[in-house]
């Protein structure tokens, strides 16, 4: 598993030449080979925690707000020689192929979460077998990433994003991108949101 923070990504919503403390945009590893390797840092946090320098993560959404430490474009990187999406699907006997994201709910510790996608397809015997609706997936962060069995190659990578990532008191809103290749997860809890809403 390889996850990067990147303030330089082409077309990234959190891409900057310089952050709001004057630190140049840069790219760094957050997770390398499945092990925590780096952090998002502004000048204050770098000083408090003994790091040599900020990696350019200070952002203010306007002149009336102090800069906060904010997320860079955070992306799960593809495997250099990873499989195609079709090859990943071919290895699934019974599952769901989820494209994009639509809504999300996550607790303050960023541990328990529920997400929905934009499109859903049933997988049966290694093939797509019709569309689904009213699908959500639910997990804890550690269980979810621990369920990852395979990551697709560069041809499966997509950079998406959100314009309204909110943080702080008083609240500030920042745009941010997240990139991801196709990935195969096993044993993730799936919900029928139509049934859940009716109960």
PLM features per residue range, with description:
Residues 1-199:
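N-terminal small-residue-enriched
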């Amino acid at each position: 598993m390889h996850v990067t923070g990147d303030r330089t990504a082409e077309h990234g919503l959190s891409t900057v030449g310089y952050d709001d403390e004057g630190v140049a945009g840069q790219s760094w590893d957050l997770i390398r080979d499945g092990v925590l390797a780096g952090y998002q840092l502004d000048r204050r946090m770098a000083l408090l925690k003994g790091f040599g320098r900020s990696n350019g993560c200070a952002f203010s959404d306007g002149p009336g707000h102090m800069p906060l430490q904010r997320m860079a474009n955070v992306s799960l990187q593809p495997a250099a020689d990873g499989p195609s999406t079709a090859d990943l699907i071919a290895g699934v006997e019974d599952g769901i192929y989820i494209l994009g994201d639509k809504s999300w709910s996550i607790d303050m510790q960023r541990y328990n979460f529920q997400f929905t996608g934009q499109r859903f397809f049933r997988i049966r015997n290694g093939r797509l077998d019709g569309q689904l609706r009213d699908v959500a997936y639910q997990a804890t962060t550690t269980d979810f990433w621990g369920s990852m069995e395979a990551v697709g190659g560069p041809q499966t990578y997509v950079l998406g994003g959100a314009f309204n990532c909110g943080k702080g008191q008083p609240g500030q809103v920042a745009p941010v991108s997240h990139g991801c290749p196709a990935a195969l997860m096993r044993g993730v809890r799936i919900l029928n949101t139509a049934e859940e809403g009716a109960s």
